[in-house]
């Protein structure tokens, strides 16, 4: 306790007084007994006794942690690939795709770097850098590789859901939103007439619709993956036997069957995307040769 503008320590108890002084002010030092309880989290300077009888002690705490916590709120910079940990795209970004690249001359926007670069060729020879300029940089689209949360309320991938978890990247989020929250314009042209939101899902379903996958033990399955799991689980005496001419029951599959079907259809979506990228790389070289020969690019494509 303090007595007559002097301080003393009673036993092992520490006395701490919050400072009201301005930051950076230098206080004269006083003789102070060493506390028997060292502080690992904070430091306290010597208390100052002024002529008015008021004792002031400056409290100096450690700096805050260097790790920045992203709340995903109003901090827009928290959504960049350099600082952010996840991304919550808006509904328009999910349906249309985020615009990543802009022409520096006319401000026309593109969602692919190579399309923007080829568009700029039409603005003059100073922008013509050859086919290699179409490849762009990896950092320009790094935000598309961030884990994404769904913006739909009530979705298990929404950040406010009690058991929420992010999706792998932006493309996975787009497919998820179409499947779970979007319209289903694709209808099976066979007897079941089941509807789908993703074209790849629809194609895969029609390819296998009406088929049963049989095991030699007599069990039948609607999905080839289920048959493989059955054979792997029971081992000897079980093997695949396919019958493709038999029509199975009509109606919606149960939830487990739908999840198995979606896992198979993810592979189809990735194959379609890879084929599209390969065709695009070939077309870029053809378009560049066409531009060098005729000096123009169709505005319909760009």
Swiss-Prot record:
Disruption phenotype: Defects in venation pattern in leaves and cotyledons, altered phyllotaxy of vegetative leaves, short roots, delay in leaf initiation and reduced apical dominance. Residues 26-38 have a biased composition (Polar residues). InterPro entries: C2CH-3rd_BIRD-IDD, WIP1/2/3/4/5/6, Znf_C2H2_sf, Znf_C2H2_type. Residues 252-274 have a biased composition (Acidic residues). Keywords: Metal-binding, Nucleus, Repeat, Transcription, Transcription regulation, Zinc, Zinc-finger. This is Zinc finger protein WIP6. One of its GO terms (cellular component) is nucleus. Residues 1-78, 245-281 are annotated as: Disordered. A motif (Nuclear localization signal) lies at residues 178-181, 222-225. It is found in: Nucleus. Probable transcriptional regulator. Involved in leaf vasculature patterning. GO terms for molecular function: DNA-binding transcription factor activity; zinc ion binding.
